[in-house]
Swiss-Prot record:
The active site is at 143 (proton acceptor). The lineage of its organism: Bacteria, Pseudomonadati, Pseudomonadota, Gammaproteobacteria, Enterobacterales. The keyword Oxidoreductase applies. This is Dye-decolorizing peroxidase YfeX. PANTHER family: DEFERROCHELATASE/PEROXIDASE, DYP-TYPE PEROXIDASE FAMILY PROTEIN. Its EC number is 1.11.1.-. The gene is yfeX. Keywords: Cytoplasm, Heme, Iron, Metal-binding, Oxidoreductase, Peroxidase. It comes from the Bacteria.
Length: 299
């Protein structure tokens, strides 16, 4: 069985760092850099076992095609953007995702990543996420309630089972900027109708009582009676005085599941848009492929 990269399956991490970058020059330098980083990561994982450290190196479409010789990751493509610009694309070449129970350890690993990749990449965005009170989003609503729980269930959803991509996963990242002043102008009832869950108790509002535009309705999708599940590794980010919001991060064995949720949220299926857009907006978006650790080490 191919070994999964260690940042895909962990639950309830308290902190994360996401680094998106473009390749400088030829992609061949990424091969040695990826292996060097994986070796450094293993050292940190052994040194800080209680941190439950994990990390992922993933690649955008053009970069993965160049690294793999065009083999595998058949669903992978550049993030096209959705909703006629409501969900913009900021596709980059490389994603590094680091997560654990300790921000200090994450930061040390991020420094190691910068040493490993060096001049072969140009960092375009670096975001530090944190777990907020009761695993709530900064909106005050619990985030990720329907996230698959347990390693085997999460593996079933997030990891490709067999074939040339066995042990790999598709990744989607999208940074949302919240306008909490706008949110707080709404009554709690109106906020709950936007999300589709009660705010304090985190109870699902019945489908016939919540609007078709509620967030829950837009993303709770089924095909042939089966839910289109994803594994979320999202966290709040930002500063109290400035920009803040949610860094959305999802892993799935099928890019299809992620894309169907996006099409539904941004009105590309039935013209109805997620009511969350009343108080928050996405400002980035990228699709990536995370190969198995075995394949990453053998690039």
């Amino acid at each position: 069985m191919s070994q999964v990269q260690s940042g895909i399956l962990p639950e309830h991490c308290r902190a994360a760092i996401w680094i998106e970058a473009n390749v400088k020059g030829e992609v061949d330098a990424l091969r040695a850099a990826s292996k060097t980083f994986a070796d450094k990561l293993a050292t940190f994982e052994a040194k800080f076992p209680d941190a439950h450290l994990g990390a992922v190196v993933a690649f955008g479409n053009n970069t993965w095609r160049a690294l793999s010789g065009g083999v595998g990751a058949e669903e992978l493509k550049d993030f096209p953007g959705y909703g006629k610009g409501l969900a913009p694309t900021t596709q980059f070449d490389v994603l590094i995702h680091i997560l654990s129970l300790r921000h200090d350890v994450n930061f040390s690993v991020a420094q190691a990543a910068m040493e490993a990749f060096g001049d072969c990449i140009e960092v375009k965005e670096e975001i530090h996420g944190f777990r907020w009170v009761e695993e709530r989003d900064l909106s005050g609503f619990v985030d990720g309630t329907e996230n698959p729980a347990g390693e085997e269930t999460r593996r079933e959803v997030a990891v490709i089972k067999d074939g040339v991509d066995a042990g790999g996963s598709y990744v989607f990242v999208q940074r949302w900027e919240h306008n909490l002043k706008q949110l707080n102008r709404m009554s709690v009832h109106d906020q709950e109708m936007v999300i589709g869950r009660t705010k304090e108790a985190n109870e699902e509002i019945d489908g016939d009582e919540r609007p078709e535009t509620s967030h829950l309705t837009r993303v709770d999708l089924k095909e042939d009676g089966k839910g289109l599940k994803i594994v979320r590794q999202s966290l709040p980010y930002g500063t109290a005085s400035g920009t803040h919001g949610l860094y959305f991060c999802a892993y799935c064995a099928r890019l299809h599941n992620i894309e169907q949720q996006l099409l539904s949220m941004f009105g590309d299926t039935d013209g109805k848009r997620d009511a969350m857009l009343r108080f928050t907006k996405p400002v980035t978006g990228g699709y990536y492929f995370a190969p198995s650790l075995d394949k990453l080490m053998a690039l």
